[in-house]
Structure formats: structure tokens, C-alpha cells
Amino acid sequence: MPFSLGQRWISDTESELGLGTVVALEGRMVTLMFPATDENRLFSRTDAPLTRVIFNPGDKAESHEGWSLTVSEVEEKDNLIIYHGIHSETGEQASLRETLLNHNIRFNKPQDRLFAGQIDRLERFGVRYQCQLLRHKLATSDLLGLQGPRVGLIPHQQWIAHEVGRRFAPRVLLADEVGLGKTIEAGLIIHQQLLTGRAERILVIVPDTLRHQWLVEMLRRFNLKFSVFDEDRCIEAYADNDNPFYTEQLVICSLELLRKKKRLEQALDADWDLMVVDEAHHLEWTEDAPSRAYRVVEALSEVVPGVLLLTATPDQLGHQSHFARLRLLDPDRFYDYEAFLKEESSYKDVASAADALASGNKLPDDAINSLTELLSEKDITPSINVIQATDIDPDQQQDARDELLQELLDRHGTGRVLYRNSRASVKGFPTRIFNAYPQAMPSQYVTAARVGAMMNGHLDTQGKVKQALSPEKIYQDFDSNSASWWKFDPRVDWLINFLKENRRKKVLIIASQAETALSLEEALRTREGIQTTVFHEGMSIIERDKAGAYFAQETGGAQALICSEIGSEGRNFQFASQLILFDLPLNPDLLEQRIGRLDRIGQNNDVEIHVPYLEKTAQECLMQWYHKGLNAFEQTCPSGHILFSEFAEPLLDVLINQNDDSLTELLNHTQTRYKELKTVMEQGRDKLLEINSHGGERANKLVQSLAARDEDTQLIGSVIRLWDVIGVEQEDCGENAIVLNPSEHMMFPTYPGLPEDGITVTFDREMALSRDDIALITQEHPIVQTGLDLITSSETGTTSVAVLKNKALPAGTIFLELIYMADASAPKSSQLYRYLPPTPVRILLDKNGNNLSDNVTYESFNKQLSAVNRHIASKLVNASQTILHPLFAKGEEFAEVELKLLADSARAKMTSQLTLELERLEALKAVNPNIRDEELEHIREQMNELNGYLDGCLLQLDAIRLVLVSHA
């Protein structure tokens, strides 16, 4: 390379240094000073990664004094360049020597980089274009937010998330039965709301015992980094903000923290977009005396636009409390309890009509009459005729059924605010096997009970029942050695023998009290050395996590985990299938929660439930009532709370007095009432609610679409090429898994999201679900999104030169491939990306300015190209400049035409979709008060905003590839 003092060059490998000046020439070396960064670099004259900066007529050259020159003539004198042209400030003729050019010049625009000789490798152009296509594909996906989470593709969960997550400020109650995955549904909704920009600030309120579990679950399953707030964290945050809640976007805290007046006031003032409340059945309410917890959540629900309430037992604390939770979601709609009860009484007709539609059979006359009356504002005769016909395609008939079902669901009941799936409507659950083990009552307990009855006559009914169910507690009250009870309790002997006989099986043991759990751990450890661990409310969150992990270890882990009632709430251990109930809770819903720790979706084995009990005691009576009265061990019992409230008095009497005749009578009455309630529930509102909640065939199709995305080999290839170009080390570690590590040769100094010690990843959902230590890679994963951002926000791949070896074309023929990005600046929350996301526009020009892109695809063209080295590429560009300048202008004309087509198409799509949705909701509002005014107004405002953003849509040249035909 011919170097001279004072010449200006730019580094191809360190463009951030700015413009360099040749300051020394010694032998075979050249020294450049970079004034912008005050650094020097020494290069070999023969192979320096440098490009001479020479502007062309028409370019703007900037002086180090701040003014610029529109170049009209380029003069070379003594190997230095002098530019002549028009002064930007005076408008007069002026000259500018290259030594006086602005030191901070950087060539960011693709055409500037091309003419400055900053030319990228051929494959980088392709990777950049693929990155832009991937970003566009994700933004336009109607499944955005559902594919990325590390969760199983379970239809009802995905359906609820799909329906709720797409709404503006959703306000719903998620009330699936235990084990159906409400936390996953909530996480999917949160993930969707964040990815689509519908929400940015999210507050999750959970019981204190579940804070860390939510933190881990959100990170491990959804790649969402929440922060746990307690009083200490709030105090620390004062250093950054007067309101601690403003220091993070995603916050998890306990209800206890918000009971404090100051913290509640700060939370109310924190501009949340979405609030999630777990275990919402703890929010007790009466019209005259709402609980403090309820009032806290109510205050927040009045200022936070979106609200998700999670509860497995919507009626656990009574129907009135269920109404109160609906009231939190929409106080205007659920304003009066009596009116709510009256409306519920009409659900039976709706459910019967829905059942007839869902049956797949011809509709009886009474069902047709009922449907006609319920949907009186619409002529449904054509749909009825299709359903009743005998010569019509079954798929067409099913479409007609689905349409009428949707009309029913939209217009009646709480379908838009309440989702509740039951095990009866969701497949995939194991069989429950119940085993009872009678044990003789120890004489020590008999004596303690007799003494206790004399001394504790003042106890109320609840106190007496509690003592009757836990004789070990009575004994401990009279024995100085409170732990000695396990030395003679036959249930402990049975437990030890069971564990010894089933050494290879993981066993979950649940007892009501933490003290009992600790005593059992001591007994198993000291008497037989059985590896166990405990889990109770007195332990810290980290201690519980360690205990859970120790139990989960297949090799060297604990055989048994002993939990207290409260300590196990919200924790799931479906890798185990043996459940021992050392005692029984006095509440059918708590019993179901215990069994639900193992009996849930994801359980691959039958769940065996073992109940050791003391004969002829309250324990046996309660076990009999649960088993023979409610069938609660072998089946879920949705009516358990109703039966318990109805039979509480005779049940408590039987537990205290243990009268056989009274027990027999109680069991008979309970069985009769159980069957009645089961029949009522089959016929009532629940059927319609479940049809809406599990999604039916639509949910199955949704899951099929997601599964097809998982099998997209094109995505896998694109992501691996992306990591190759960035310089990420990739090492296969078994079938379907890759270890990613940062390398010293990465294109970028840091790769956010890629740990320094590496990460193991897979594209296989099943593997990711079976291995917590392996990340599931989809297009939505942060490590992929970050990689796409690194490429598209940098200059990587913006310029390229290639050779096309094709003897059918004249040698020296030029093609210019231009990639433009059509984009409109708009806040993410506007949802503009649904209609016009950043869109790559490809233009392929021949030397005459003809656009060949419709006839020559990118893939077919790219396969024929070969790379050239950078020095030759730079010479080819310089030799082609006179041809290229008019081609750029021509390319922009073609791109502008494409931009208008894109904008018009986006406007038509937006207007059609939102107008249709607005008209649908306006029609529904006339017959279903669940439609909120805010939803309608939001759509109207959104249409106006989007039209404005589309008017401002712009083009930007993103990448250039110059191609020359060669016969060599």
C-alpha cells in the first residue's frame, strides 16, 4: 500500500477509533495516530487492515472545525487529497485538505462503508438478512409469547394464555382445580404481555412462603428476572428512589409487606400495568367487614389496569367470597351479591344448550328452542339447518356448532372473567390408588386422652376435635419429653417398615404440624438411618429449596420428604408417586391440596395414597367420611367444601364421640347429598365454563401449531449460524444438547445473557422439560433475541462483495442487491408490530436498473455466489462507482413503491381486524355486561394512533451486496 504522511485511513477492525492519520513511516511499518481516541497503532505496510478514506463528488466531507463541504472536485497533490466544493456555512467555494478532516468520522451508512472500503465477509451479509427475517417472523406471529417458555404444550394452559394474554389490561380469575397449572397459565400471560408491550411493570403478590418459588419459576420457565421485595429491600432501595417499587420493573412481594400503610401507599403510586395475586382464596370478604388482605388488593385493583387472581378453590371460603373476588375484577359488573345469585340461576339453561351443541348429536327440539331464545338478537336458523342436515360435511357441521357455542360463551355468564378447568374435562391425569392401614391405639394415648378429657372440658368443639385427631399432641402436653411419642406410636413403626420395603421409591409424607414433621424426621434418622429431609413453615425459603432439591436428587438424595401442612403449600413433587398422609386435615380442600402435590399434570405414574390411622378413633371416622362419603381419596371432590359446611355439625359430633350408629347415618346422608351435588354440577354452569376454559378443538390446533414451530429446522440452522458468526464456542454434549461458551475471538466484547462459564442449551422441548439445567432455545429466548440485536444494531454484514460464476452472463456484469428496512417509530404498547413490524425489503438490480427480485429469490441467488478477499472487493467497488450511484437512486424508488404497498396493506389489515373486534364487542355489550367500556375505548384510540404511526413509516437502507459476474 502507498502510504504518505498526513493521509487519512480508517481501521477495518477497530472502526470505533475514528479517522487515523499517518504520522510515521519506518521500514516496513507505518504508524497511525487516531486523534478522536488519542491512541496510536503500528501496522505492517504490506498487509494492514486499513482502508484509505477518499470522498467522491456529491459527498459531504466534514472539517475538524465543525463545518462541512459538499464535494464537487477531488484533487490529489503529493499523495494527499484536497477537496473543493461549497462551504456549508458561507455557501461559497472552499477547499479542505484531508489532514483537516473531522477525526470522529465513522462510516455507519452502508453506502458510506462500501465506498470507504469497509467490506464484510460474504456470509455476514446473509446472516444479517436472516436475522432481519427472523425478527420480522417473530413480530408477525400470532403465537408471540407462547413458544418461548419452558413448559409442556398442554392445550388448556396454552388456550387460556392465548385468550387472556392478547387482551389489553386483562382482568380475570384463574381458578383451575389443583394440579392443572395455574402458575404456568399466569406465567404465559405475563410473558405474552411483556413481549407484546401490553405491559412493562408487573407486581406479583404471593404468600410469603411462595416468594422464592415464584422467583425461580419465572426465571427457569419464562426467562423473566423478577426481584423479590421485602422490608429490607425497600429500605436499601431508598438510595436510588424515594419509592422503592420504582427501582425494578418486575416485582414479587408478599401480602404481609403491603399490609404496612407506607408500603401500600408506595405500591399504589408505582404505575403498575399488571398485578397478579396468587392464593386469592385467602382474600375473605363480607359486605360489612372485608378483611385487611382484601382491602389491600382492592385498593391496588382500583389503580392497576390488569389484574390476574389465582385460586384453585373459588368457593373454598364460601360463595360470597367467590363473588367478592369477581368484584375485584369488575366492581361495576359485580355490584350486588343477590343480583349475582339471581343471574347464576339462569346458567342451567345456557349449560344445557351448550351441552347439546358439544355432544355432536342432532339437536332435540327443546335445545333448538332454548338456543333460539338465548341468541334472540341473531338469526341462527342457517346454522341450525347445517347441524341438523344429514348430507353435509361433518367438518362444516362442527364449524356451525363451534360458532353457536362461541356465541353462547360470549353472551352469557362470566366467561370472559373466569376460567376454571376441572380434571373431568382435562385428560392426562394418573389413577389414584387408596390404601388404609389400621393401627391399634397405644395405651399411652388412651390414658392421655382420658386425662385430657377431664382437664380440658372448657375447650370448644374445634379444640376438642383437634385433640381427638392428634392424640400425640395430647400426650406431649403431659410428657416432659415431647418427642418420646414416636417411640410407641404404631404409625411410626408402620412408616419405618414401609420405607424399608420401598427403598427405591421417593415418598412424600405430609403431617398437619411442623412439630410432628420434625419428630418424624428424628425418628426415621435415629431408629433406622433413613435418608429424609423436612419441609415446614419455620424454615427459610432457601432452606426449603435445598430440602426440595435434596429430595429430588435421583442418586444420593433423600428417600422421603416430610412436610407440614403450610410448608408444602404451592410446592409440587410429581417426580414422586408415593404419598403418605400421617394424619388428615379437617377440610376436604386441604386434603385435595395435599394429594395435588403429586397428582397433577406431568405425573407419569399412578399415585398411591397411604393412610395409617388409629383404630376406633376420630382418625378412623374422618378417614371413613372422606373415603365413603366424598370418595375424596380416589377422585377429586369439587363439592367437598359444600358438603363440609352442610355436615360440619354431625361430623364434628362423630369425631368427638366416635359413635358407630351416628357415623353410619352420617355416611349415608353424605353419600346421598354427594350424588345430588354431582348431578347438579354436571348440569349446571360448570359445563359451559369448562367448554370456554379448555378451548376444545381450537386449543388442540393451537398446540399443534406450537409443536410445528418446535420442529422448524430452518430456525435451528439460522440460530447456529448466528452463533458461528458472533464467535460463540459450540460443543455437542449428547444428542440434542449444545454447550455454549464465550470465546476470546467473539465479534463483540460481551454477549448479554451468555454466562461467562457457559450454558447448556437444546432445541428439544422434551429434553428441556426433563432437565432443569438445560435451557430451551426458541426464537423468543433472550439469548437468541440478544444475538439478533447484536447483529442488526451493529454494522455487521451491511456491506459485501461477491462473484457470480456464470458463463451464460457476460463477464463483468454487475448486480446490486439492496436490503431496506421498512419501519415506523411507535411505542411497543401501540401493537403496531402486529400490522407492520420492521420489514426487510429486498431489491435486486441489474446494471440497467431493472428490479429482478421477484424473479430471482435470495436463496437461489445466494447459492451461486463466491467470496472475494477484501482488497479485491475494494478495488471492484472503486471501479464500479460511476455505475453504482445512479443504481442506489433507482433502488430507493423501487423500495418506496414497496413501502407504500406495505403501509396500505398494514392499514387495511389493522382497520379490518380492529373494526371487526370493535363491532363484535359493541354487539356483545348489549347482551353481556362483562364487556368493559375501557376495552371499547382502547380499540378506538388504538385505531387513531396506528393510523398516525403508519403515516410516518420510513425506509432505511440496511445492507448492500455488490455482485460481479466472472468466468474465471
From Swiss-Prot:
Write down the InterPro entries for this protein, in alphabetical order. Answer: Helicase_ATP-bd, Helicase_C-like, Helicase_RapA, P-loop_NTPase, RapA_C, SNF2-like_sf, SNF2/RAD54-like_C, SNF2_N
Q: Where is this motif: DEAH box?
A: 278-281
Instruction: Determine the domain of life of the protein's source.
Output: Bacteria
Please name the GO terms that the record assigns under molecular function.
ATP binding; DNA binding; helicase activity; hydrolase activity, acting on acid anhydrides
Choose any GO biological process term that the UniProt entry carries and state it: regulation of DNA-templated transcription
Q: Which residues form the Helicase C-terminal domain?
A: 491-641
SMART domains reported in the protein's UniProt record? DEXDc, HELICc
For whether the record's keyword set contains Transcription regulation, the answer is yes
Q: Which UniProt keywords apply?
A: Activator, ATP-binding, DNA-binding, Helicase, Hydrolase, Nucleotide-binding, Transcription, Transcription regulation
What EC number(s) is this enzyme filed under?
Answer: 3.6.4.-
Give residue ranges for domain Helicase ATP-binding.
163-332
**SUPFAM superfamilies on file:** P-loop containing nucleoside triphosphate hydrolases
Q: How does it assemble?
A: Interacts with the RNAP. Has a higher affinity for the core RNAP than for the holoenzyme. Its ATPase activity is stimulated by binding to RNAP.
Question: What job does this protein perform?
Answer: Transcription regulator that activates transcription by stimulating RNA polymerase (RNAP) recycling in case of stress conditions such as supercoiled DNA or high salt concentrations. Probably acts by releasing the RNAP, when it is trapped or immobilized on tightly supercoiled DNA. Does not activate transcription on linear DNA. Probably not involved in DNA repair.
Q: Which family does it belong to?
A: Belongs to the SNF2/RAD54 helicase family. RapA subfamily.
Q: Which NCBIfam families match?
A: PRK04914.1
What protein name does the entry list?
Answer: RNA polymerase-associated protein RapA
